Amino acid sequence: MTFGAKTSGSDDLKAIISAISTLVEEATFVATAEGISFRGMDPSHVALIDISWPNSAFEKYECDSDIKFGVRIDEFSKLIKRADKKDSIEISISEQNMLLVTVGKNKKYKMRLIESSATDTPLPKIPYDSKIILSSSKFDKILGDVQVVSDYLTIHTSDSKGDFSGKGDSGEVVIDLDKDDEGIEEISSKEDSVGTYSLEYLNPVVKAVGTTAGFITCEFSSAKPLRIEFKVANIGRIHFYLAPRVES
């Protein structure tokens, strides 16, 4: 079994590991000839992240047979954070079943792999009625504006207009969107849709990935999970699913 993957810089891998760490403590990656993937759900089954990292995104990539390898995310993250922005990161697996991590030219780590306890998690199959495509920086700012007054984000669309809002004990906020606004690429809706989602899950993932993503796509339907797609040039795609808030 031969497996090795080398990045040209550290930012993309840092973004991936940071995003995964917002949901799980242990992660099982799947490596094939096509690339590396990860899919995991938080313990409460509220959020799910699905990552596909194609072989073309790596400076060097080799995998002659499909393998799974599990790591403790906090330990892996500590190693990755030792890399400077321009440092390459190379990972491989030794015959002793250790993860070998080379950071830059002279830092070589060994990390013990863990037994995979992950089960195959199917992706939600949902016909979405509404879509908003906007810049990651604009979305991050909107989340910050809403979090001032609320722990939840409500998204509403109607035709080619939409709004983000939040309400809490201290007050409320509504941020209107128009398709001609700066940072907005598309607002479309087959029918009026509204959904409310937890910022506790949403904020960390957007902050983790947002710096490496240009535009993000939010898709939702009334009372259905939110689906966010991050397109990152050197990663491929990251999909994040978040269950709606259920009013008691």
UniProtKB/Swiss-Prot annotation:
User: Which positions carry the signal peptide feature in this UniProt record?
Assistant: none
Gene Ontology molecular function, alphabetical: DNA binding; DNA polymerase processivity factor activity
Cross-referenced Gene3D superfamilies, in alphabetical order? 3.70.10.10
Alphabetically list the UniProt keywords. Answer: DNA replication, DNA-binding
InterPro entries (UniProt xref): DNA_clamp_sf, Pr_cel_nuc_antig, Pr_cel_nuc_antig_C, Pr_cel_nuc_antig_N
GO biological process terms, alphabetically, are: leading strand elongation; regulation of DNA replication
Name residues in a coiled coil. Answer: none
What do we know about how this protein assembles, alone or with others? Homotrimer. The subunits circularize to form a toroid; DNA passes through its center. Replication factor C (RFC) is required to load the toroid on the DNA.
Q: Which family does it belong to?
A: Belongs to the PCNA family.
**Described function:** Sliding clamp subunit that acts as a moving platform for DNA processing. Responsible for tethering the catalytic subunit of DNA polymerase and other proteins to DNA during high-speed replication.
Name of the protein? DNA polymerase sliding clamp
Q: From which organism does this entry originate?
A: Nitrosopumilus maritimus (strain SCM1)
